[in-house]
Amino acid sequence: MAFPSLSAGQNPWRNLSSEELEKQYSPSRWVIHTKPEEVVGNFVQIGSQATQKARATRRNQLDVPYGDGEGEKLDIYFPDEDSKAFPLFLFLHGGYWQSGSKDDSAFMVNPLTAQGIVVVIVAYDIAPKGTLDQMVDQVTRSVVFLQRRYPSNEGIYLCGHSAGAHLAAMVLLARWTKHGVTPNLQGFLLVSGIYDLEPLIATSQNDPLRMTLEDAQRNSPQRHLDVVPAQPVAPACPVLVLVGQHDSPEFHRQSKEFYETLLRVGWKASFQQLRGVDHFDIIENLTREDDVLTQIILKTVFQKL
């Protein structure tokens, strides 16, 4: 299959040295609130504590299988009040497709369930066990599973961070007829994501992934939005592309260009830079109801109801 090719002018990353490219795609090197060598550990600790609190204080169903694979599990957290019709918020963790877990990713559970939203944290097989193609398939099937499990839902809102934002963006390209169900997708929130994977091939991030050029091109939503027919999701389904002020320039470029492509091909897209946050605390802060991103999520969900 031939993939859309972009010129060097359209790909400014081609002008970067290998050292600069490595820096641009190393989020920990751009943080300002903590030491680069400590930020990932802090992120995992905050996520683990939030998950432990959510499991202790919210009704939940853990390790629900959405497929036959060992890694195909998800955690479901419920509001206090019982209801057969509720919005579903699905979160896909980051970690460059090679780290991270649903077991340390329930940052937003307490603030969102307090407002009547069911929160689902999805696991997928990270590298080296899982390939990008497998991860995309797993995430897509998790959405199908939840639509079938909760057919009366008031909307599915898919949110991903970093690598998870990439996987969520790939769901925009899903062919639902293949799965025999059209999910009630009502919103996408793509946080600090990567939408063209080719720049990563020459970085250390690719060591566990072992991505080839074809792998990267096939799994780059930036390259397929305008060549794949519009999918059967709600015409007014918003796609919010968000990036932290202190994400790297390459993360900013990728987010802005993906937003512009979304607009060009007819999606209801918006772009927002969140001030004062980096690649990590943009998600860490979701433990707070008064956080900017928490409020964006609530507004996105409830303005649709």
From Swiss-Prot:
A motif (HGGXW) lies at residues 93-97. Its EC number is 3.5.1.9. Changing residue 162 to A: Loss of enzyme activity. Keywords: Cytoplasm, Hydrolase, Nucleus, Tryptophan catabolism. GO terms for molecular function: arylformamidase activity. It catalyses: N-formyl-L-kynurenine + H2O = L-kynurenine + formate + H(+). Pfam families: BD-FAE (PF20434). One of its GO terms (biological process) is 'de novo' NAD biosynthetic process from L-tryptophan. Belongs to the kynurenine formamidase family. Homodimer. This is Kynurenine formamidase. The lineage of its organism: Eukaryota, Metazoa, Chordata, Craniata, Vertebrata. The gene is Afmid.
